[in-house]
């Protein structure tokens, strides 16, 4: 029996970004009663840990949250006796992970994540780390059979929104997206039900469907029956992310199968920029999706990207002037502001100030304005 340590970076380990944090605090406070629960350490449970825990049932598993700095992780690892330490690398923590591994040279690390260029370079430079592109590869490195499912025992009692997978892939081909496109691979009904039942260890009212574009896979209608597998008497439904076009066409059906909230890939309210980035959307579809959702009592959140090359004072203003009145009127319940990430150029990724091009000041102004205005509206 092996000793496996999962390391997860808590929100508090990262720099605070001012208006962004104010917005999310306001959002979770406003919608807490319907089930928007923020975890004690992180916004949501890291699903990769639950997936790996599922296929190593016979190992001793331990979870460690890094709340402040890498010194905590280094001390934990060097004072323990672990066969493997597992971490997930993102732009925001990549240099922290590199430091941890370099300071624990006798420890074996398995690392997965999103920035392949950085991870491959790290693997070349540090002999005690192996990169795993998928959880299936992690199973291979651990020498166990891979089986998809989830085990949330390590998170027992946490007050959160768990994630559930119906399918992998996406039929769209958005220019800035790293999700494999052109094909959808559905998950079996048996595995979908297993995931739902595994949430019994958690305190939740909403479940987030983490398909990149909900409604593309043929099995999305299973949500209608899936609610009965929740052991929570106050279960309130599902959150999905999808396109404006699918919401415009299927808002009524989504509500009928217990979708409570839809996040739409609005990104920017500008046709020219949407076309440039191959978004399956338009100003027309965006308007239609808002109307359809409102008419069918489907709560709507607009995902917005700040920093897209091509944005100007005029285009930002157009998006802002479209979105904020909808938030005021309750036709949107929130926005999801995100920073544009160019994964082919990772020199300055991971912090709000990575956008150091000629539009840096403009992007920064609008990032703060979107977050501050939305927070003010939700705080009322």
Predicted regions and their residues:
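A short, flexible N-terminal coil/short beta segment enriched in small residues
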Residues: 1-55
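Conserved SAM/AdoMet-binding glycine-rich loop
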Residues: 4-6, 193-301, 306-311, 330
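C-terminal accessory regions of radical SAM enzymes
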Residues: 4-16, 314-380
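Short hydrophobic segments within beta-strands
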Residues: 7-9, 88, 112, 167, ...
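Canonical Radical SAM [4Fe-4S] cluster-binding loop centered on the CxxxCxxC motif
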Residues: 17, 29, 34-41, 46, ...
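Glycine-rich beta-alpha loop elements in corrinoid/cobalamin-binding modules
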Residues: 48, 55-149, 335
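Short beta-alpha junction loops
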Residues: 113-118, 306-308, 339-341
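Catalytic cores of alpha/beta
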Residues: 120-125, 250, 309-325
């Amino acid at each position: 029996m092996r000793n496996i340590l999962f390391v997860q970076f808590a929100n508090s380990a990262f720099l605070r970004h001012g208006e962004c944090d104010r917005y999310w605090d306001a959002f979770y406070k406003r919608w807490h009663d319907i089930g928007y629960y923020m975890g004690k350490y992180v916004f949501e449970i890291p699903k990769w840990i639950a997936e790996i825990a599922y296929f190593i049932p016979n190992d001793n598993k331990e979870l460690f949250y890094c709340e402040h700095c890498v010194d905590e992780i280094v001390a934990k690892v060097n004072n323990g006796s672990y066969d493997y330490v597992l971490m997930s690398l993102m732009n925001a923590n990549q240099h922290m992970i590199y430091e941890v591994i370099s300071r624990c040279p006798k420890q074996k690390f398995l690392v997965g994540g999103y920035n392949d260029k950085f991870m491959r370079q790290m693997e070349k430079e540090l002999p005690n780390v192996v990169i795993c592109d998928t959880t299936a590869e992690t199973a291979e490195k651990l020498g166990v059979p891979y089986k998809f499912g989830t085990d949330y025992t390590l998170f027992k009692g946490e007050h959160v929104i768990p994630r559930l997978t119906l399918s992998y892939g996406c039929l769209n081909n958005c220019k800035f997206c790293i999700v494999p496109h052109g094909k959808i691979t559905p998950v079996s009904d048996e595995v979908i039900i297993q995931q739902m039942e595994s949430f019994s260890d958690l305190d939740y009212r909403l479940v987030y469907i983490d398909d990149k574009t909900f409604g593309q896979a043929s099995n999305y209608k299973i949500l209608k029956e899936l609610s009965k597998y929740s052991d929570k008497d106050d279960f309130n439904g599902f959150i999905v992310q999808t396109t404006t076009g699918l919401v415009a066409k299927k808002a009524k059906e989504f509500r009928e199968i217990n979708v409570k909230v839809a996040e739409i890939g609005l990104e920017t309210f500008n046709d020219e920029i949407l076309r440039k980035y191959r978004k399956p959307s338009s100003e027309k579809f965006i308007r239609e999706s808002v109307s359809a959702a409102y008419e069918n009592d489907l709560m709507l959140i607009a995902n917005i990207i700040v920093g897209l090359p091509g944005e100007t004072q005029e285009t930002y203003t157009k998006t802002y002037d479209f979105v904020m009145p909808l938030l005021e009127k309750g036709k949107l319940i929130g926005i999801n502001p995100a920073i544009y990430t160019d994964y082919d150029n990772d020199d300055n990724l991971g912090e709000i100030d990575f956008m150091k091009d000629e539009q840096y000041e403009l992007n920064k102004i609008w990032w703060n304005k979107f977050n501050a205005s939305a927070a003010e509206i939700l705080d009322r």
